[in-house]
Amino acid sequence: INIILENSLSVYKVDVRKLKELNPDYIITQAHCEVCAVSFSEVENIVSKNLNKNTKIISLQPNTLKDVFDDIKRVAKELNIENEINNNLIKSLSERLKKIKELSSKQKNKPLVACIEWIDPLMIAGNWIPEMVGIAGGENILGKSGNNSHWVKFKEILNQNPEIIIFLPCGFNIEKTKEEVKYLFKQNSEWQSLKAVKNKKLFIADGNQFFNRPGPRLIESLEIFAEIINPSLFNFNHKG
């Protein structure tokens, strides 16, 4: 899988037979990452060769939470359910986000948080993740809101010495991530010197189900961040 990542190849493939069987009117895809999902160009190519010309492709490429909200509205408009989505889903998501922001803003101390999107080689999460960490009451390190996720050396994490570390790799469930993190720590004992590890503030999250997929579940992801960063303020029952 590392070779796939290093060469920016997708770990997913389109089931052409199933797609032809379904014969959809709309296909929602993304042009954000060619590793985490099938590339936009591949989807276009498959659709042009196997489906009728009336099939419409809706491609999303968000970088921030605002972009994600805008994309939800755009999809709703394309599907002619704009009023329903704006009055229900968007309203609900916005209210949940606002409550977290208001409560976490009262905290004076913002712990340093490292969000790791890939384990070998190490990749720091970007795009909407740094923004979400900030809303939840933390100070994100190494990643910048709106910028792409990027590779880092362990020394960079060591120098920042984060108080909280969250592993949320794309494509792995929690059990697989646990295995990878254990192996990572065996390979480099210096991880044990970090504040987050010493103080038992190292967390593993399901990046595949949450965090890395730009959609409504990012608000659930924000709630998970809030519980991790400010457990005395938030309890959404996501821990498990």
Tell where the protein language model's regions lie, with residue ranges:
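N-terminal ligand-binding lobe of clamshell/alpha-beta domains
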Residues: 1-240
